[in-house]
Amino acid sequence: SSDLRVVTLPDKKLIFQVRTIFLRSKEMIVVLSLFMFSIVAAMIWLMAGNVSALYDDAALGALDVPLKFSLASFVVFSFLSFEMSYKLRRYKLDECMDTVTHAKRKIFLAQGIVFAVVIFAFFIVFNIWWLISFIKYRNFNCWHGKFIIQTVLNMLLSHFFLPCCAAAMGMSASLLFHRINGCLGLVLFTLLGSPLSNYLGEMFYSFSRDVSINIFPFLRLFDVFPPSLNYAPIFAFGQSVLPYRWLTVLFWFMLSLFVISLKTGERNRRFRAAPAVFALFAFAFLVVSQIPASRVA
């Protein structure tokens, strides 16, 4: 087991190098600072507002706001991860580690560890927001056991698992495409997963009434963000954690790991089966996510 650990895991020095490159990158720090500022500003604005104790929906609407940052989190961490992969390539760490077994794989793993730590820090911030909201709206009737569980699951999915998936997708995009094409691919994914996709599906259907082209089954592949239910926010919490959304996020995460393991895998029998395993899991999650039962609470 010790030999396997030496082969697979990056050492502390490599993680420190990747972290140093990350912290010295002005664009990384500026983007993360702006993202943090927007979160804190929204938190202060909501906490400073007055909500009538007679309307639970008003409180639920305020509690729904952190979910709306899910799309922004995906954009931030997918593009930063994509950019970081190119930045590490410019530093040529893999060439400096030619004598180290599985150098390229270790560099990507070190990058993943650094991003997981950053994502976890933002996850803590969102949970602090939720706790402050709980204190402010503690007298509202919405605070029952099922709602609290749904809120915790929403925080875990929208602000930890999905950003981790975004970081993995950014790394895999850097291995598959050139810089411009990779950026366009991430933009396209974001648009297809955003509420704009509903208008796109309706547009296709309305313009093809004779043949009835329905692209909504295809758009389900990108349904990883919380649904927009401003008119009835109480449903947003339950609808956001239905099984299909977890499965869809896991599908893209496993697909990204498949690409990373395939592109960074050296000829070694210990890792030869890794891409196949990730591909098998991705296919299984995709199939189960399309089952109608996965969309029922």
Region locations from a protein language model:
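Hydrophobic alpha-helical transmembrane segments
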Residues: 2-88, 254-277, 281-297
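Terminal transmembrane helical anchor/hairpin motif
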Residues: 2, 48-52, 184-271, 291-297
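Helix-loop-helix units of permease transmembrane domains in multi-pass membrane transporters
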Residues: 82-118
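Membrane-interface helix-boundary motifs at transmembrane edges
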Residues: 97, 106, 173-181, 262-273
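Secretory targeting signals
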Residues: 42-76, 82-83, 109-178
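Aromatic-anchored segments of alpha-helical transmembrane domains
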Residues: 37-45, 123-129, 188-200, 281-290
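Pore- or pathway-lining transmembrane helices of multi-pass membrane proteins that form conduits
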Residues: 30-34, 179-197, 275-279
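Alpha-helical transmembrane segments of integral membrane proteins, especially early/N-terminal helices
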Residues: 24-43, 76-78, 114-124, 203-217
